């Protein structure tokens, strides 16, 4: 149990996808203008990561040498299968949001289908395969990585909303000051890197 708790804390804070590995930055910066939209996208990322990492772990275990047929190694198919599973889960999420939460679906716009090619999603799945997590570890890691990404984007959206009323220099208004805020947040999250769990 302690191992899973440390893996969860590590995936949320120490190895934060957005602020430590700088993965998923296109949607991270583009959708961080309003807290409500950032929260909705964060929940969507938690859903996709929380499902795609464990599902891809099961698929990857079938691709390993001798898993299906003795002497047959299908690990060269891992990237294409990972992308297929992620795309299917994002499509299911998109249909669900369109049907039941149309306001969030419209607010996310093009960024919802872009979760399919979000490097934070693929990065978490690749880390799972590289680190050879078992199914339980992949569930904890996927949920923790999604929660960490959501924490980062909601925090940045809150800062961005407050900065609308600040007197920023003309050349830094908009994306410029957002980059500076994201960089300062990343520096703050680097303080967690010295923690050994």
Swiss-Prot record:
Its main location: membrane. It catalyses: a ubiquinone + n Na(+)(in) + NADH + H(+) = a ubiquinol + n Na(+)(out) + NAD(+). GO terms for molecular function: oxidoreductase activity, acting on NAD(P)H, quinone or similar compound as acceptor. Coiled coil: none annotated. GO terms for biological process: respiratory electron transport chain; sodium ion transport. It is a multi-pass membrane protein. It comes from the Bacteria. The keyword Heme does not apply. It is an enzyme of class 7 (translocase). It is found in: Cell inner membrane. The chain crosses the membrane at residues 11-31, 35-55, 76-96, 108-128, 139-159, 175-195. InterPro entries: NqrDE/RnfAE, NqrDE/RnfAE_oxidrdctase, NqrE. GO terms for cellular component: Gram-negative-bacterium-type cell wall; plasma membrane. Keywords: Cell inner membrane, Cell membrane, Ion transport, Membrane, NAD, Sodium, Sodium transport, Translocase, Transmembrane, Transmembrane helix, Transport, Ubiquinone. Its EC number is 7.2.1.1. NCBIfam families: nqrE (TIGR01940). Belongs to the NqrDE/RnfAE family. Composed of six subunits; NqrA, NqrB, NqrC, NqrD, NqrE and NqrF. NQR complex catalyzes the reduction of ubiquinone-1 to ubiquinol by two successive reactions, coupled with the transport of Na(+) ions from the cytoplasm to the periplasm. NqrA to NqrE are probably involved in the second step, the conversion of ubisemiquinone to ubiquinol. This is Na(+)-translocating NADH-quinone reductase subunit E. It comes from Neisseria meningitidis serogroup C / serotype 2a (strain ATCC 700532 / DSM 15464 / FAM18).
């Amino acid at each position: 149990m302690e191992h899973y708790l440390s893996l969860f804390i590590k995936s949320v804070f120490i190895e934060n996808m957005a602020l430590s590995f700088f993965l998923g930055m296109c949607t991270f910066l583009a959708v961080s203008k309003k807290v409500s939209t950032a929260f909705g996208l964060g929940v969507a990322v938690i859903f996709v990561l929380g499902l795609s990492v464990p599902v891809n772990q099961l698929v990857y275990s079938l691709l390993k040498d001798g898993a299906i047929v003795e002497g047959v190694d299908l690990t060269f198919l891992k990237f294409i299968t990972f992308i297929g599973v992620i795309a299917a889960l994002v499509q299911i999420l998109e249909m669900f949001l369109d049907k039941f939460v149309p306001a969030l679906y419209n607010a996310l716009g093009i960024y919802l289908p872009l979760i399919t090619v979000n490097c934070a999603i693929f990065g978490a799945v690749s880390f799972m395969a590289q680190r050879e997590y078992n199914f339980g570890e992949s569930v904890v890691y996927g949920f923790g990585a999604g929660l960490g990404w959501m924490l980062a984007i909601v925090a940045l959206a809150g800062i961005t909303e407050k900065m609308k009323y600040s007197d920023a220099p003309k050349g830094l208004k908009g994306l410029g000051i957002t980059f500076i805020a994201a960089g300062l947040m990343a520096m703050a999250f680097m303080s967690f890197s010295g923690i050994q769990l």
